[in-house]
């Protein structure tokens, strides 16, 4: 016979609080890597498409995650993620000059 699972630890924070925290973190990171005007236009597109709904919040989270992932994968010039450090040092030391 099936039984309900026992209470396993503290209650997780509500989904909407967690979702808004994630959105704020992604927005802060996106502003460091993309033009504000471009992000504003993206926000306007999401608002026009979804209105002021949770579906819109989830959509913009998904899009920002994908954009930041691709940005880092290609090789962000704002961080060391995706950059070959040896190439970076050679350029700084002038080793690539002919």
UniProtKB/Swiss-Prot annotation:
InterPro entries referenced in this protein's UniProt entry, alphabetically: RetroV_VpR/X
One Pfam match: VPR
Region described as Homooligomerization: 1-42
The record's account of how the chain is modified after translation: Phosphorylated on several residues by host. These phosphorylations regulate VPR activity for the nuclear import of the HIV-1 pre-integration complex.
The keyword Phosphoprotein appears for this protein: yes
Residues with Phosphoserine modification: 79, 98
Keyword Transcription: yes
GO BP annotations, alphabetical order: DNA-templated transcription; monoatomic ion transmembrane transport; protein homooligomerization; regulation of DNA-templated transcription; symbiont entry into host cell; symbiont-mediated activation of host apoptosis; symbiont-mediated arrest of host cell cycle during G2/M transition; viral penetration into host nucleus
Subunit structure: Homooligomer, may form homodimer. Interacts with p6-gag region of the Pr55 Gag precursor protein through a (Leu-X-X)4 motif near the C-terminus of the P6gag protein. Interacts with host UNG. May interact with host RAD23A/HHR23A. Interacts with host VPRBP/DCAF1, leading to hijack the CUL4A-RBX1-DDB1-DCAF1/VPRBP complex, mediating ubiquitination of host proteins such as TERT and ZGPAT and arrest of the cell cycle in G2 phase.
Family under the similarity heading: Belongs to the HIV-1 VPR protein family.
Misc. comment: HIV-1 lineages are divided in three main groups, M (for Major), O (for Outlier), and N (for New, or Non-M, Non-O). The vast majority of strains found worldwide belong to the group M. Group O seems to be endemic to and largely confined to Cameroon and neighboring countries in West Central Africa, where these viruses represent a small minority of HIV-1 strains. The group N is represented by a limited number of isolates from Cameroonian persons. The group M is further subdivided in 9 clades or subtypes (A to D, F to H, J and K).
Function statement: During virus replication, may deplete host UNG protein, and incude G2-M cell cycle arrest. Acts by targeting specific host proteins for degradation by the 26S proteasome, through association with the cellular CUL4A-DDB1 E3 ligase complex by direct interaction with host VPRPB/DCAF-1. Cell cycle arrest reportedly occurs within hours of infection and is not blocked by antiviral agents, suggesting that it is initiated by the VPR carried into the virion. Additionally, VPR induces apoptosis in a cell cycle dependent manner suggesting that these two effects are mechanistically linked. During virus entry, plays a role in the transport of the viral pre-integration (PIC) complex to the host nucleus. This function is crucial for viral infection of non-dividing macrophages. May act directly at the nuclear pore complex, by binding nucleoporins phenylalanine-glycine (FG)-repeat regions.
Protein name (record): Protein Vpr
Species whose genome carries this gene: Simian immunodeficiency virus (isolate MB66) (SIV-cpz)
Lineage of the organism: Viruses, Riboviria, Pararnavirae, Artverviricota, Revtraviricetes
């Amino acid at each position: 016979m099936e039984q309900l699972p026992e209470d396993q630890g503290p209650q997780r924070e509500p989904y909407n609080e967690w979702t808004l925290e994630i959105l704020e973190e992604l927005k802060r990171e996106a502003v460091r890597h993309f033009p504000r005007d471009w992000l504003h236009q993206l926000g306007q597109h999401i608002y026009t498409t979804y209105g002021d709904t949770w579906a819109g919040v989830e959509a913009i989270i998904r899009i920002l995650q994908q954009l930041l992932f691709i940005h880092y994968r290609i090789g962000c010039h704002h961080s060391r993620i995706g950059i070959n450090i040896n190439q970076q040092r050679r350029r700084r030391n002038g080793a690539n000059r002919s």
